Amino acid sequence: MLFRSDALAKGAQLLTGGETTQNVLMPAHVVSGVTQDMKLFRDESFGPVVGVIRARDEAHAIKLANDTEYGLSAAVFTRDTARGLRVARQIKSGICHVNGPTVHDEAQMPFGGVGASGYGRFGGKAGIDSFTELRWITMETQPGHFPI
């Protein structure tokens, strides 16, 4: 609620959300008019809230996406998938989805962020590689015979 309250106090508009029902702990929220001075823009959130931020053009959208210390996951939505891939490659995040949600996890895929969102990669071989160091230990059980 902190992210939503801060954004609304600074001029953003609540497009949907806020309705409490008996079976929902926290309803989803869509907030429009989010600017760079709002917590919803600046801080990493795992709650059911999305901020709508308008960009002037593609370059501005990439700049906005990268203007944060966090970088767990991003998504690019477009009709032109080649353009979406080009944009995705410029966004500083551990994961970037083209035409898919920011939450997509598969056990065999490396999952993790960059910047303040990063502690390595979880999942499959990447998880093992991130949290282990390769060592080589040899042992001879019999004395060696070396020609000296």
Describe every region a protein language model picked out.
Residues 11-18:
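Short secondary-structure junctions
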Residues 22-148:
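Conserved C-terminal structural/oligomerization subdomain of aldehyde/semialdehyde dehydrogenase
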